[in-house]
Every structure is written in structure tokens, then in C-alpha cells.
Amino acid sequence: MIDKRDDKPFKLKSKYKPSGDQPQAIESLVDNIEGGEKAQILLGATGTGKTYTMSQVISKVNKPTLVIAHNKTLAGQLYGEFKEFFPDNAVEYFVSYYDYYQPEAYVPSSDTYIEKDSSVNDEIDKLRHSATSSLLERNDVIVVASVSCIYGLGSPKEYADSAVSLRPGQEISRDTLLNQLVDIQFERNDIDFQRGCFRVRGDVVEVFPASRDEHAFRVEFFGDEIDRICEIESLTGKTIGEVDHLVLFPATHFVTNDEHMEQSIAKIQAELAEQLQLFESEGKLLEAQRLRQRTEYDIEMLREMGYTSGVENYSRHMDGRSPGEPPYTLLDFFPEDFLIMIDESHMTMGQIKGMYNGDQARKQMLVDYGFRLPSALDNRPLRREEFESHVHQIVYVSATPGEYEMSQTNTIIEQIIRPTGLLDPEIDVRSSMGQMDDLLGEINQRVARDERTFITTLTKKMAEDLTDYLKEMGVKVKYMHSDIKTLERTEIIRDLRLGIFDVLIGINLLREGIDVPEVSLVAILDADKEGFLRNERGLIQTIGRAARNVDGHVIMYADKMTDSMQRAIDETARRREIQIAYNKAHGIVPQTIKKDIRGLISISKTSHNDISKEEMDYESMSRGERKEAINALQKQMQEAAELLDFELAAQMRDLILELKLMD
């Protein structure tokens, strides 16, 4: 039985106090939640402190909260901010744990079967386990997630019921504990002690939970009784302290007991027989042979090991669900009365809607050609209406709410005033004739003031041509395209803030969540080309990138005024008017946002020693020695980045740059 700690309140720690229209927004949101309002919108302009407002609301309503962002980068940024606001509570991070993922697929036109290929990030897997275990053990939990939280995860009841609960004085033999650990997918490894493993030394069993990365537990037996349980450092074995209760959750989210496994296998066999009969009646002998071979192999693995590659495709049988019934997801791990906050809801809700259809189209092909049983179709993300059925209370957060959110509620709470007094930027509309020379002049003005520039284009070719042109003109510029990975994107933003380059060019990467106070100019090329990237919502989001600097300015290059441009300009002017009036009434002088230059997310520290300039005298080294030092630093930098410790990786990157300049 898991003893859930439900008496610990959320405790917000911050040097800031609500200001501007934050107090009114916080009070309205809290009153509506406590009054039972199901859905409401926080319409917060860029830079008004929406995350701080969300934190204040969470601390006041005191409910377990799920915050959903539309990509890993934004989820990481929010995770870092919530960790700072709630250091004494459980702030968790739940995103897809794949560094690389090629889903299983079949292309009939070329008779090509593509096997599932993936690379799991061990650090993120640990954080996912930490999230689910926290939800089952306590109520003061904030989980920051990407939309991967609506994918199948395994039954929370099976996960909780399989947990092993241990206390000093408990009567249980060492061998019984070992069998229980194997049943919940822990592996015995007396040499390489890592997450999801245990090791045995006489009457001592050491267990490394799947949700930890530095600390494990030592269970000491005296006969058939637990004598003592200690928390230990996993690397050194040094005792940190004694614990009076230890709960060990399964090492995988897909777990079942022996009796349930046999029932599941019987259902898989029955479905297999039915599908084989169908294929044979249709003359699809190759498909029938393929399906029999693959499924019987999986059944054998499930019987022998309790697990098989692709076990999630049998999750309907494992969970005891009916055909078409929605899968269990992270949302099922929350108690009934929980709060959902959707960040950048105009993007995130669109993703939630689109996940199901794309998944089904790919899997149907696998079923039709005998690679998977039809039940594999029920290993899927939730449909939007299924997601809605989990919603008890929800807050949509966006500077530009979408039509869906607007259709869900009439309760819209505006947050327009920035705590720093910053105004929405002034907007110029200029002709596209001679735009390159005009833009170069504007960039040079910003470079002279040590400020940065964002440029957004509509096509990859224009972005590349503009990058080449500006480089020829002596501008330090980078182009951020869609092929750049998340970690690299984070480094590019950091380099821009540090002034390693002055201009960043992109297509659809400059709109939400890129927080660079040093940017004082946003240039929008082809502003009059109506479409997804140049509609009212997209333009307002892009304009918002210049709203964190006191000298923020936006230039739209266009040959005509579109309705979207006019509406975006009018809305920005409306907000400016409100902000100017507030500043005047309260004697506020606008100030550029001050924000530390750090990685977007820092989850854990690497175990590697940082080679600092103080520790090693690089200047007295020979060129060859410095080259060796650079190679060593580059290796450590890569390892730090893989562990998502961007701050350490960035420090090493800066040191490498300095060393290269010495030569």
C-alpha cells in the first residue's frame, strides 16, 4: 500500500511580487477555479510574466497540475522556471524519451518494411519515472510535459499495485524481495550498478530505482526480517541517511503480473487465430505467415521474459481494454481533481488534435500487411475528445488564443501590462523595394548599440540568400533552420545573447518561446503574403519577440496592407495604449528585461570534472598540449550536452573558443 503524502502545500518562492495587471489576473483565475469554472483563457501578452502568474495560481489553488507545452524546448524552459519557483515541491518533466525515433512502418509501393529504430535518452526516461512515482506518492506535484503525455503509458493501477513497499522490521526474506524485483522488471547486475538494477552482497540488497540517477537504497536483512534501509550514493556506496519507508515502483511503465500475463497472452492468441483466418480466406498467405511468425515470437518472449520489443502494441490486451477504448496515459496518473494549463495553447491544442490521425494511418498499413495485429491500433495517442474527457479544470495560456479555445469558454482574462513597464513595440511598414539595403542599415545601428536582430523570412531559399548577403557585408549572422536539433537550437540562442553573432534568421522558429531581451529589432519579410506564418496570430507572436527590450521595434516589409497586418497592428496599438496609460498613472519608466544567460534546462549535473582555467595553466602549454586539452574539453562538452546540462556544456564551449584564439 502506498502512503500518499497529501498534506504538503505548494510553496512559491520568488523575489518578485505580482505587479502590473498580474494581481487582477491571478485573483480572477483563482476565483474562477475555486468557483468551479471548467475552462478559462489567460490572454497574456509576451513578456508579461505568464509563467509567474501560472505559478501564483498553482500555489493558491493547491491542486496537482499538468502544464503542457508544444515542444521539448518550451517544456524545458518552463520546467526550469517552475523548479526555481517551487524548490520544495515536486516539479517533474515528462517528454518523449527518444533522442531518435523511426516508427515501424510499411510502404506497399516498394514492398519496404521499416523496422522501429530508436535511441532512448536515459536521463529523460529517469525523469518520466520520477513524474509517475511522484504523482502516486504525493499531491504537491507539477508535471511539465510535451504532447507526448497523451500517448499510451500503461495502467496506473498495475503500476501502483506492482510497487514493492519496504519498512524496517518487515518480515520478508531476501529471496522473496529478489523475486519481487525481477517481477517488476529490475535486473540483477552486481558489476554495473545503474538505474533499474539491483545487486546482492550476502544479506544486503542494493536497489537503484528507475526514477533516480545519483542515489540508491541499501536494504539490510537479519534473517527473514528487514533490519535497516539506507539511502546511499550510487557511485561510492556512502550512506546518506536511514529511511523508514521505501516504495520501489516498476522499472518500466508497461508491467503486469504472471496471472494477468497469461490472460493477456490468451487474448493475443485468440486475436491471432481470428486474423489468420481472415487473411487465409482472402488468399493473403504471405501476410498470414508473416503475422504468425512475428506474433508467436513475441508471445514466447512475453512468457519467458515478461517483456518483448514492441510490447506497447499489445497494450490493449495487457490493460484489459475493449477494442477502441482509449489507452491509459499520464493523465490517468493524476487524481480526479487536478488542474491542466496549456501553454501556447493556439499551437498545443492543434497538436493534440492532429496526433491521432497521423498515428492511425501508419499503423493501419502495418495491420493490413500482416506486420501487426489489429489491436496495435489501440496503442495510440488520445483523440481530442478523449483528452477533453480527462479535463476537470483547464487554463489556456496564449498571447493569441486559437478558435478552439475561444469556442470552449467566454472567460478571458487579459494580462497586458509588463512588470518592467515595457511597451509593445512600434511597427513600421516599409516597401520591399530596396529592403536589403534598408535592413542592413537598421542592423548596423543595432550592432553599434550591442543589440540583436531577428529576421523572419517565408522560404528557406530567401533565408539562405539573405544569410549569404549579410555575411558578405560583414554582419555576424546565423540561419536557424528546421534541421537543427533541440540542443543545438538552445546553443544558438545562447550564442546570440552572448553576442557571438548579432543577427538570427529563421522561418517558423522565431515566434513562440524564444526569449532574448537583447533583441531590439524584428524584421518581417513578405509580411503581406497571407498564410499560416503571416496571419494575424502569427504576426502578433512574431511582433512579441521585440517586446522584451525598451528599444523594441518591428519593421514589416510589404507592398500592400493585408487584413491580417492591419489587425495585428491595431491590436498592438491597443495594447500599447493600455500600457502607456498604466505607466503614466504609476510613474513607471520602462526597462529592458534582465535575464541571466543560462541553458534552457538544467536537469542534472554531469559526473565529469570541469577543466577550468584556474585548474590548468593553458597559456604555458605548447600548441600540441593545447590541442589535446581542446579535444578533451570537446568530449566533455558533448557528454554534458547529452545529459542536458547546457550550462556546463556552454562553459566548456566558451573555454574551447578562448583556447583556439591562443593559437
UniProtKB/Swiss-Prot annotation:
Which part of the chain is the Helicase C-terminal domain? Answer: 435-601
> What does the record give as the organism's lineage?
Bacteria, Bacillati, Bacillota, Bacilli, Lactobacillales
Q: Where is the composition biased (Basic and acidic residues)?
A: 1-10
The record's function comment reads: The UvrABC repair system catalyzes the recognition and processing of DNA lesions. A damage recognition complex composed of 2 UvrA and 2 UvrB subunits scans DNA for abnormalities. Upon binding of the UvrA(2)B(2) complex to a putative damaged site, the DNA wraps around one UvrB monomer. DNA wrap is dependent on ATP binding by UvrB and probably causes local melting of the DNA helix, facilitating insertion of UvrB beta-hairpin between the DNA strands. Then UvrB probes one DNA strand for the presence of a lesion.
Q: Which InterPro entries match?
A: Helicase/UvrB_N, Helicase_ATP-bd, Helicase_C-like, P-loop_NTPase, UVR_dom, UVR_dom_sf, UvrB, UvrB_inter
> Which intervals of this chain are the motif Beta-hairpin?
97-120
Which top-rank group of organisms is this from? Answer: Bacteria
Q: What is this protein called?
A: UvrABC system protein B
Disulfide pairs here are none
Which family is it part of? Answer: Belongs to the UvrB family.
